[in-house]
Amino acid sequence: MPHSVSEFIRFYNSPFSYWCNKTNKLVDEKKIDAKYKIQINASKLVSKQLLTKAQEHEVVLKDKYRISENLNVVDMSNKDSSNKVFLEQLNKNPDVIFQPYISSKDFVGRLDFVKILDDELHIIDAKLSSSIKTEHIMQLFVYREILETVSKKQVTECFLFLGDLQMHKVEFDKYKEIYAELKNQFMDFNNSYDPETPPYPKKGEELQEYDDEAKKIWIRDNGLELLYRIQAKQIEKLKNNDIKTVEELKNTNLEKIDGMGEATFIKYKKLAQLLNDSTENKISYEIKDASLNGLLKPNKGDLYIDFEGYPFLTIGRNFEYLYGIWSNNKNDSFTYYWSDDEEEEKNSFVSFIEKLLEHLELYPDAKFYHYFSYEISSLRKSAQNFGVYEKELEQLIEKKCFIDLFTIVNSSLLIGASSYSLKTVEKLAGINRTEDLQSGMESIQYFEDYFFNEEYELKDLIIEYNKADCKNLYLLHDWLASLL
C-alpha cells in the first residue's frame, strides 16, 4: 500500500507526530485496538481557512495559465483519477494538467501542476510560503519520483509558486542524498512500526496536534526537553555525558562539558534546579539582574497593549482585528478597537496610533508595555500596508516609548518553567485566569467561528480574553517592579 506524500512530509518534520497520526488512523480503521487512540490538541490542527487560502492560491496560477497565457489546461481536481486516466490525458498532449492523482509502488499523491513540453515534464507546486523550505523540496522529490515512474518521461525542472506570486526554480543536486536517506528511514520506520513503542519526541520537531502528547512523555521521563529554550543538539551533548534527565542535570558534579560553553551549562543546571523545585501552582525563580534590565516602576499614564491577529485572510501579514489598551490610571480602564474588514482595520490602526500620540501629550513620560515583539512588528506592517503614520511610529520606537516586558523577564530572571509565555510568567505574580478562552490559538479558532460561521456571541469572549491580557501585563509589571 503506497504512502501519501503528506504522510512522508509529516515524518520529515517529526517521526513522533507521524507515529501518532499513523496510530490514530489505524485505530479509526479498526486495524488496532482502540486503547491506542491518542488525544490531539485541536487548536494545532491545520485551519480550514488556511486550506481554503491554499486552494485559492492554486486557482490563481491555474487562471494565469488558462487565461493570461492561453494554455490548454486539463483540470483533474474534481475527477476520479488514476494512473490510467492521467496517462490518457497526458497522451492528448495538453499544455498543463492540474491536480492529477497518481501513484507509484511507494507513494501516492495529488500534484498541483504538471507542465508538458514535448518529451519532458515540469512540476509546479503552489505554496503560500514566502520562501523555499527543505520540506517543499522533499515533497517535490516524491512528486518527481511518482511522475517519472508513471509517465516514463523525465522531469527536467521543478518550480514553486510562492506567496509572492512568483515562480522559484528548485535546485535538487545538493538534496539528493538527503532525500534518499530520508526515504530509507521512512520505509524502515513503517516496516518496524509498533503501536507499543513510539519514537521519542525530540525538541524542535514540528509536533503539530500531538504536542501535548509529547509533553506528557517529557514530563513522565523528567526529560531534558522540559528546560526552557534548550535545543536538540544541546540535549545530545548532555546525554553524551550521561545526563539524561532534569534530575540528573540538577545533581551532576560536572562544572562543564565538551561542546557547551561553561556559562550555558551552568545556566541549564540552575534551570534544572528551579524546574525541579516548581509545582503546577508555584513556579520557582531566581533574579539574575537586580536592576531588571533598567525596568521603570509603573507610572501614571502608562499603557498596556495587546493585539489579536488572524493569519489566514491576507498573504504576508496578519489581519489585526483587535487592538486592546489597558490604562493604569485611578479608574483602571480598557479601550479596544475591533475590525470586521480591512477598511475597519485601517480605521482601527489609525485610531490606535492617534490614541497613543494624544496620550503622550497628556503624559509625556508614559510608556507602552507589551509582551514579545509581535505588537511592534504588527504596527510596522500595518503602517506600511496602509501608508499612514510610518514616520510617527518609528519616532515612538526610537524614543523607546514601547517596552517589551518579555525582554525584561528573559534577561533578568531564571524561571523554573518550560515556557516564558505571558500565561506562564503571570503565575509568578499570582495571577489566575478565569476566562473561558485561555490561549492565543484558541482565540484564532474563536475568531474563525465568529467571522466565517457567524457565531457572533464569541466576539465578547475574545474581547474579554484580550482585556485580561492587557490587564495582566499591568499586574505583571507591578509585580516585577516590587522586585527592585
Segments predicted by a language model, with ranges:
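Metal-dependent nuclease catalytic cores that hydrolyze phosphodiester bonds in DNA/RNA
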Residues: 1-117
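A residue-level signal for conserved active-site and pocket-lining positions in enzyme catalytic cores
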Residues: 14, 113, 143, 231, ...
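Short, amphipathic alpha-helical segments that act as regulatory/interfacial helices
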Residues: 58, 62, 144, 380, ...
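Short linear loop/turn motifs
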Residues: 77-81, 251-255, 264-271, 436-448
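Conserved DEDDh/DEDDy metal-dependent 3′-5′ exonuclease domain
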Residues: 78-80, 89, 93-104, 108-190, ...
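Acidic, Mg2+-coordinating catalytic module of metal-dependent nucleases/exonucleases
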Residues: 158-164, 170-223, 232, 241, ...
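C-terminal extensions
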Residues: 211-327, 333-334
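Generic beta-strand/beta-sheet core signal
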Residues: 252, 305, 326-328, 369-372, ...
